[in-house]
From Swiss-Prot:
Keywords: 4Fe-4S, Iron, Iron-sulfur, Metal-binding, S-adenosyl-L-methionine. Its cofactor is [4Fe-4S] cluster. This is UPF0026 protein HP_0117. Pfam families: Radical_SAM. It comes from Helicobacter pylori (strain ATCC 700392 / 26695) (Campylobacter pylori). InterPro entries: Aldolase_TIM, GTPase_Obg, rSAM. [4Fe-4S] cluster binds at C33, C37, C40. Gene3D superfamilies: Aldolase class I. It comes from the Bacteria. Residues 18-248 form the Radical SAM core domain. The keyword Metal-binding applies. GO terms for molecular function: 4 iron, 4 sulfur cluster binding; catalytic activity; metal ion binding. SUPFAM superfamilies: Radical SAM enzymes (SSF102114).
């Protein structure tokens, strides 16, 4: 019996951070990536410079159109990903420009490791997306080599590419930082990442740790450790895994000025607020909103209370 080809389109699946998502895999039958991350759930594979198996863009377009035509419920976002790194796909610009006209209000999202943002062709394609999410697990070179095991170890070139792209991109730019215990969770690495992200127009930081079996049996951080790591990202909208949020059992009791100072240092997610604020502090949010001292900023499907 002939083996069926893996599906190009999958879902819809419900994403807490982006809503109901229909996924598109640009490399469904083979892992093709320029990283070999120790947390990757796709298995170990030698990092490559370019895709060895390339699906025709017409095949991808037809698969996406068919999936959209057969949807029984509306979706929030079409997510371009890959069994590896989607920006390695050589026809990415043609693909996104071809599918946007028939998305009918559905947002477009790409999940990337951020390593090729310095390439003009990649930048041109990424500019077409409503949301671009990239990974930045390490800036410290030793940590970068250990956690991401990249094809190219030029972290400065990667950072320069992300910085330049952020200066021309008009959509929502989201960073993902995945921390491995004893590998990239040092204070030095966290300070470097936070300082870099504060330079760019970042909409949100998704901070997480291992939650699924990985290629190298990488150790995860505890809930408390991850919460402590989030404090390095002062002033940025930080999204933690839902399990981490529910671990915050101690309710914060504070006056309105203290709450405003807290939000000024670190935007507070609307999901997190009722879990960590006592009833009086939670009521202060409405007062601060009415007095236009804070505002609600939406990033993907998550909302944050932010100071002006």
């Amino acid at each position: 019996m002939a083996k069926e080809n893996p599906p190009i389109v999958f879902g819809p699946v419900l994403s807490r951070r982006f809503g109901k998502s229909l996924g598109v895999d640009l490399s469904p039958s083979k892992k093709q990536c320029n990283y070999n991350c120790i947390y990757c759930e796709l298995g170990k594979a030698k990092p490559i410079e370019r895709m060895e198996e390339v699906i025709k863009v017409e095949t991808l377009i037809n698969a996406i159109q068919n999936a959209l035509n057969n949807l029984t419920t509306p979706i929030d976002v079409l997510t371009i990903t890959a069994n590896g790194e989607p920006t390695l796909y050589p026809h990415l610009l043609e693909l996104i420009q071809s599918i946007k006209p028939f998305l009918k209000g559905v947002k477009t999202l790409i999940l990337s490791n951020g390593s090729l943002f310095y390439e003009p062709k990649v930048q041109q394609a990424l500019k077409e997306f409503d949301i671009v999410k990239f990974s930045l697990d390490a800036i410290d070179l030793k940590a970068f080599e250990r956690v991401d095991k990249p094809y190219s170890k030029d972290i400065n070139k990667i950072l320069e590419g992300i910085l330049r792209f952020s200066q021309i991109y008009q959509g929502q730019l989201v960073a993902e930082v995945l921390l491995i215990k004893g590998v990239n969770d040092s204070a030095n690495n966290l300070k470097l990442i936070a300082a870099f992200l504060k330079q760019i127009n970042i909409a949100r930081v998704d901070l997480s740790t291992i939650d699924r079996p990985s290629s190298f049996k990488a150790p995860k951080l505890s809930e408390d450790e991850l919460l402590k790591c989030s404090l390095f990202f002062e002033g940025l909208c930080v999204s933690l895994p839902k399990r981490s949020i529910t671990q915050a059992k101690k309710l914060i009791s504070c006056g309105i000025d203290e709450l405003l100072a807290l939000i000024s240092r670190r935007p507070l997610s609307a999901e997190e607020a009722p879990l960590i604020l006592d009833s009086n502090a939670f009521k202060h949010l409405e007062t601060l909103l009415n007095h236009k001292q804070i505002t609600i900023k939406k990033v993907g499907s998550l909302e944050f209370y932010c100071a002006f």
